[in-house]
């Protein structure tokens, strides 16, 4: 493939896709990623996964503070790219930048557009109980995920799949979809189909508070919520020990109880069952497997329960 490609991306998802392109000998003339960020509880700067991969392959790298900076835009022009590929870069790009490459900018979106436009399509699709996801490649315009569709593929969401697991599956197939798109751009056969605005939905970035579990819902819905916010921002609930204030309990792993009848009041702690802690939902129950009490280490849910002699019998 002779196309000159500039790649813009930041997290591990984008690094996985970039590796697929590099393994296929795509001519990546430059990489753009976000500026290094301080590590949590430390002043040490952490490089993005995309930066680490680019440096390991000796690919020219830019980390602009602002993508509207004239010096940055001038450097992009010097690379004389035929096409820009954007994958989870993390910034909405202005038209001046989109107009630089000969054939435009193409974005790999980890969702089936026009549904789930925004930063969290993977998480919100699972939280909504979705059973099918996929990648969409669009030719970018100045809107948020509003460009014409060039290619789509599909990935089934397994009944126990978390957002982390779906992200891995989408990244693995997304690189191949981009290779197909680049081949079509080079051959002049790529199609651009406008999105159906009537079908558009939004998927804004999740907050930590949205990880909170609402037990007054069917177990299937609660389980979908837990899977959708795992590993980030993470699911949590609250618990009380007598004489103490309510504390958060992170829920790292759970599974559905096979019997779907009524067990008790929503959030009621039904006790230990095998290795799990059984919690009632509005309909059905969930088995908590791994939890993390506030300020403590990760542990088995049954060990948490057995260590809480004064635990009130309800989560909220």
From Swiss-Prot:
InterPro entries (alphabetical): Fmt (IPR005794), Formyl_trans_C (IPR005793), Formyl_trans_C_sf (IPR037022), Formyl_transf_N (IPR002376), Formyl_transf_N_sf (IPR036477), Formyl_transferase-like_C_sf (IPR011034), GART_AS (IPR001555), Met-tRNA-FMT_C (IPR044135)
GO function terms (MF aspect): methionyl-tRNA formyltransferase activity
Pfam family membership, one: Formyl_trans_N
Cited CDD domains: FMT_core_Met-tRNA-FMT_N, Met_tRNA_FMT_C
HAMAP family to which the protein is assigned, alphabetical: Formyl_trans (MF_00182)
Annotated family: Belongs to the Fmt family.
Keyword Transferase appears in the UniProt entry: yes
Disulfide bonding pattern of the chain: none
UniProt keyword annotation of Transferase present: yes
Provenance organism: Chlamydia trachomatis serovar D (strain ATCC VR-885 / DSM 19411 / UW-3/Cx)
PANTHER family hit by this protein: METHIONYL-TRNA FORMYLTRANSFERASE, METHIONYL-TRNA FORMYLTRANSFERASE, MITOCHONDRIAL
Reactions catalysed: L-methionyl-tRNA(fMet) + (6R)-10-formyltetrahydrofolate = N-formyl-L-methionyl-tRNA(fMet) + (6S)-5,6,7,8-tetrahydrofolate + H(+)
Binding site for (6S)-5,6,7,8-tetrahydrofolate: 111-114
Role description: Attaches a formyl group to the free amino group of methionyl-tRNA(fMet). The formyl group appears to play a dual role in the initiator identity of N-formylmethionyl-tRNA by promoting its recognition by IF2 and preventing the misappropriation of this tRNA by the elongation apparatus.
Gene Ontology terms: biological process: conversion of methionyl-tRNA to N-formyl-methionyl-tRNA
Signal sequence segment: none
PROSITE patterns linked: GART
GO cellular component, one term: cytosol
Entry-linked Gene3D superfamilies: Formyl transferase, C-terminal domain, Formyl transferase, N-terminal domain
Name recorded for this polypeptide: Methionyl-tRNA formyltransferase
EC number per UniProt: 2.1.2.9
UniProtKB keywords: Protein biosynthesis, Transferase
NCBIfam families: fmt
